[in-house]
Amino acid sequence: MISIILVMIGGGFGAIARSAITDYFNHKFTSKLPIATLIVNLVGSFLIGLTIGLSISISWFPAFFVTGFLGGLTTFSTLAKELTLMMTPKFDINLFLNYSLLQFIIGFIACYIGYHI
């Protein structure tokens, strides 16, 4: 039961952080590329790799930080929505492919780097 509460609390903080980051970048930058989602997913990928690589032995930490906070911070559903919305009558295949590659390949690389630090 305690792990469920830790996931809920961490997830709430992660979602608040994502919302703040999204608001900040949406007001600071105008771009065809959804930069805020890219940033939260890359930071989250790096941090999950770092967390796994450090093998933190605090019993409550994975539930609170990895599943909760990073689960709330990162967002696959928003990525899927953004990729779907790119498929308009003015569909730009290069933007679509570049954004997809940035999310998946650079996300993996960020996780890998975090793991091996």
UniProtKB/Swiss-Prot annotation:
It catalyses: fluoride(in) = fluoride(out). Na(+) binds at residues 71, 74. Na(+) is not transported, but it plays an essential structural role and its presence is essential for fluoride channel function. It comes from the Bacteria. GO terms for biological process: cellular detoxification of fluoride. One of its GO terms (cellular component) is plasma membrane. Keywords: Cell membrane, Ion channel, Ion transport, Membrane, Metal-binding, Sodium, Transmembrane, Transmembrane helix, Transport. The chain crosses the membrane at residues 1-21, 46-66, 95-115. One of its GO terms (molecular function) is fluoride channel activity. It is a multi-pass membrane protein. It is found in: Cell membrane. It holds the Pfam family CRCB. Its main location: membrane. Fluoride-specific ion channel. Important for reducing fluoride concentration in the cell, thus reducing its toxicity. HAMAP family: FluC (MF_00454). Belongs to the fluoride channel Fluc/FEX (TC 1.A.43) family. This is Fluoride-specific ion channel FluC 2. It comes from Staphylococcus aureus (strain Mu50 / ATCC 700699). The lineage of its organism: Bacteria, Bacillati, Bacillota, Bacilli, Bacillales. The gene is fluC2.
